[in-house]
Amino acid sequence: MCSAFHRAESGTELLARLEGRSSLKEIEPNLFADEDSPVHGDILEFHGPEGTGKTEMLYHLTARCILPKSEGGLEVEVLFIDTDYHFDMLRLVTILEHRLSQSSEEIIKYCLGRFFLVYCSSSTHLLLTLYSLESMFCSHPSLCLLILDSLSAFYWIDRVNGGESVNLQESTLRKCSQCLEKLVNDYRLVLFATTQTIMQKASSSSEEPSHASRRLCDVDIDYRPYLCKAWQQLVKHRMFFSKQDDSQSSNQFSLVSRCLKSNSLKKHFFIIGESGVEFC
């Protein structure tokens, strides 16, 4: 559990926790309408098959955060937890170079000074990492965005290790979810986490959109919740990623954004080029 978090906090830590977080409402106007913009405490899930642009979207949002305000960024810090060992620093640098009006090694280093990268190799490693993060959020009041790519990386390993007991299979991820909830709420963060499609859609899924909405985006949503309920209940906003099948648009991707707070459903198209994500 998260009992290890409970201790007396100093005045400095209290101020960092309550006052130091900048708003991320402007993180991507093309993706979030005003009423659906992420606010402190929000948890958003990017869901879809491999190769549908989820990690590229994370690079895009990371760049938006760590770029200086003079270059259209938010100038805030980001902590990126990589569980797939797929993070490409050169790719992030390339995106930054394309978005800076005058790119130089000094400016790139200045941007990357607001970026923190952590690797985790198992669900237990992830849990221990989350336990250790409180002091970091206390000492970095500009750290506003937590990214987890991906939360489903250890699903099959945990299933095997848990044997036939679903409770044991989900035990570590359930504790991770509880710690994520506490960190996000106590330190007024926004969390983006990716999950990969490994189950086929169930027609009776409780996550299915309404009949009218389903007609609009039926081909884009292939979702069946398979992670623990503790995680499912935390998500405020879910985005379903897919790649266009049309051979003429092999570089085009789409996502269906479902905000569970407002129950809104919107579809977006984007391409991925050398400079990163571009909305159509």
Swiss-Prot record:
Modified residues (Phosphoserine): S10
Annotated coiled-coil segments of the chain: none
Family matches, as Pfam families: Rad51 (PF08423)
GO biological process entries: centrosome cycle; DNA repair; DNA strand invasion; double-strand break repair via homologous recombination; in utero embryonic development; meiotic cell cycle; mitotic cell cycle; multicellular organism growth
Gene3D superfamilies the UniProt entry points to: P-loop containing nucleotide triphosphate hydrolases
Annotated consequence of substituting A16S: Does not affect function in double-strand break repair via homologous recombination as shown in rescue assays of XRCC2-deficient cells
Compartments reported by the entry: Nucleus; Cytoplasm, Cytoskeleton, Microtubule organizing center, Centrosome
The entry's keywords: Cytoplasm, Cytoskeleton, Disease variant, DNA damage, DNA recombination, DNA repair, DNA-binding, Fanconi anemia, Nucleus, Phosphoprotein, Premature ovarian failure
Effect of M199L: Found in patients with breast cancer; likely benign; does not affect function in double-strand break repair via homologous recombination as shown in rescue assays of XRCC2-deficient cells
Impact noted for substituting C120Y: Rare variant; found in breast cancer; uncertain significance; moderately decreased function in double-strand break repair via homologous recombination as shown in rescue assays of XRCC2-deficient cells
Source domain of life: Eukaryota
Main localisation: nucleus
Phenotype upon changing L61I: Does not affect function in double-strand break repair via homologous recombination as shown in rescue assays of XRCC2-deficient cells
Pathology noted in the entry: Fanconi anemia, complementation group U: A disorder affecting all bone marrow elements and resulting in anemia, leukopenia and thrombopenia. It is associated with cardiac, renal and limb malformations, dermal pigmentary changes, and a predisposition to the development of malignancies. At the cellular level it is associated with hypersensitivity to DNA-damaging agents, chromosomal instability (increased chromosome breakage) and defective DNA repair. Spermatogenic failure 50: An autosomal recessive infertility disorder characterized by azoospermia due to meiotic arrest at the zygotene stage of prophase I.
Function: Involved in the homologous recombination repair (HRR) pathway of double-stranded DNA, thought to repair chromosomal fragmentation, translocations and deletions. Part of the RAD51 paralog protein complex BCDX2 which acts in the BRCA1-BRCA2-dependent HR pathway. Upon DNA damage, BCDX2 acts downstream of BRCA2 recruitment and upstream of RAD51 recruitment. BCDX2 binds predominantly to the intersection of the four duplex arms of the Holliday junction and to junction of replication forks.
Known partners and oligomeric status: Interacts with RAD51D. Part of the BCDX2 complex consisting of RAD51B, RAD51C, RAD51D and XRCC2; the complex has a ring-like structure arranged into a flat disk around a central channel. In the absence of DNA, the BCDX2 subcomplex XRCC2:RAD51D formed a multimeric ring structure; in the presence of single-stranded DNA it formed a filamentous structure with the ssDNA.
Family label: Belongs to the RecA family. RAD51 subfamily.
Protein name: DNA repair protein XRCC2
